Amino acid sequence: MNNQLIYTGKAKDIYSTKDENVIRTVYKDQATMLNGARKETIDGKGALNNQISSLIFEKLNMAGVVTHYIEQISKNEQLNKKVDIIPLEVVLRNVTAGSFSKRFGVEEGRVLETPIVEFYYKNDDLNDPFINDEHMKFLGIVNDEEIAYLKGETRRINELLKDWFAQIGLNLIDFKLEFGFDKDGKIILADEFSPDNCRLWDAEGNHMDKDVFRRDLGSLTDVYQVVLEKLIAL
C-alpha cells in the first residue's frame, strides 16, 4: 500500500511507496543517545543528515559499492531500495575513541595499525551487545561466507571514506554501518552515513559529529552544516 508508515525509528521514519521494492525514508529532527534514553528535538537536523547521507551514498554508488540508495527527493526525504535489514551493527575503528577506549582502558586518539571491525547485535532490549562470529552463526543471523563479505565490504568502504574525508580536512575515527538483503538475496549497504553514525575530527581534534550532542560541546546543527558544506565542495 502506498504511503503507509511501516517503521518508525529514533532518527528516521520509513514509508511504503507505489513500488513494493522501494521505500521512502524521512529523516527526523531528533537526536538520541543511550539507545533513546535521552532524546532532544533539534530543528534542521533531519535535513542535514539526509543531505550528508545522500552525498556519501551517491559517491559510494559511483565507486561501485552496492547500496540501497536511489535518490534524494526533498531536504529530509530520500528513496531507497527495500531490504531485509540484517540485525547487526558493523563498526569499524581507525582510531581509539568512545566505548572502545572505555572498554579497554586506552586513551582516545591512538591510531590503530590495522582498522578493527566489530559486530553488535541490534536489539534495544539487550542494549545492542557485542557479538562475535560464533554468536552470529548460533543465532542464525549470517553464515561464514556472509560474515567474510561484511568484513571485507566494510574495510573497502572505509578506504573510500577515509580518503574522501581526508581531502576535506577531516579524520574518520570510526563508524557504524548496517546492511540488508535485497529482493534478490544480495547483501547491500543500507541505513545512512552521517555524523550520527561516525566520528569525525578536524585537524585540531575538534569533534565534527554526534559527540557534540553526547558531550554538550555546542550546536550540533552548526557542526553538521560545516560537514555538509565541505562534502559539497569535494
From Swiss-Prot:
* First-tier enzyme category under EC: ligase
Q: Which reaction does it catalyse?
A: 5-amino-1-(5-phospho-D-ribosyl)imidazole-4-carboxylate + L-aspartate + ATP = (2S)-2-[5-amino-1-(5-phospho-beta-D-ribosyl)imidazole-4-carboxamido]succinate + ADP + phosphate + 2 H(+)
Determine if ATP-binding is one of this entry's keywords: yes
Claim: Nucleotide-binding is one of the keywords in the record:
yes
A GO MF label: phosphoribosylaminoimidazolesuccinocarboxamide synthase activity
Q: Which family does it belong to?
A: Belongs to the SAICAR synthetase family.
For this entry, the protein name equals Phosphoribosylaminoimidazole-succinocarboxamide synthase
Source organism per entry reads: Streptococcus agalactiae serotype III (strain NEM316)
Underlying gene = purC
